[in-house]
Amino acid sequence: MKTKGDNVFLSGKEVLVMKYIQVTKENLEKEHICCAISNTKDAQVSSKKAWLSERFDEGLVFLKSVERGKCFIEYIPAEKAWNPIETEDYIYIDCLWVLGSLKGHGYSTVLLEACIADSKAKGKKGLCILSAAKKKPFLADPKYLAYKGFKVADEADNDIQLWYLPFSNEAKVPSFKACVKHSHIFM
């Protein structure tokens, strides 16, 4: 990767450097939380911000571009994730999102690399994230995950998959809890 001024050259392609900020309890109220929520006065926004504020105490990290609604990554220690997974010393990525018009410029790579560096600094053994065999809304793109070295760790009957990126060969493979692998409604 070469740089020139504010621009970076990735694979010979010149791209504008995007600046990032970590959202914390201290700046949460003034920051836009680029998510599927567009109206900043909506009750969903205040609910999401309240949820985030509580999760920061559990180790949640929210890293986003300073440009409103462009790209972000949200992750938390897997033991605190709001998903039925079993794993030790992994980081769970709640969301990795880049605005469609900005895809292909390396922004998701920058965010993912920041997550990896932070996770390793915290002594974690790897990352995990939800996806599916075929791309589904609000789930990570399986082609992107495979491209970045993630592998399928487990799959539920509803085709939802748990993907993981171990930092070493000794890292235990995460899994779904038994209650979700074969979901049934009992009457």
Q: Where would I find each of the regions flagged by the language model?
A:
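Conserved acetyl-CoA-binding loop-helix of GNAT-fold acetyltransferases
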Residues: 98, 104-119
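Conserved GNAT acetyl-CoA-binding A-motif
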Residues: 119-134
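Residue-level detector of beta-propeller blades
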Residues: 22, 69, 151-152
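A conserved beta-strand-loop-helix scaffold within acyl/acetyltransferase catalytic domains
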Residues: 49-67, 71-90, 94
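Conserved active-site alpha-helix within GNAT-family acetyltransferase domains
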Residues: 133-156
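Short amphipathic alpha-helix that is part of the acyltransferase structural core
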Residues: 4-66
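C-terminal "cap" of GNAT-fold acetyltransferases
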Residues: 157-186
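Short strand-loop junctions, especially beta-strand C-caps/beta-turns
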Residues: 96-101, 130-134
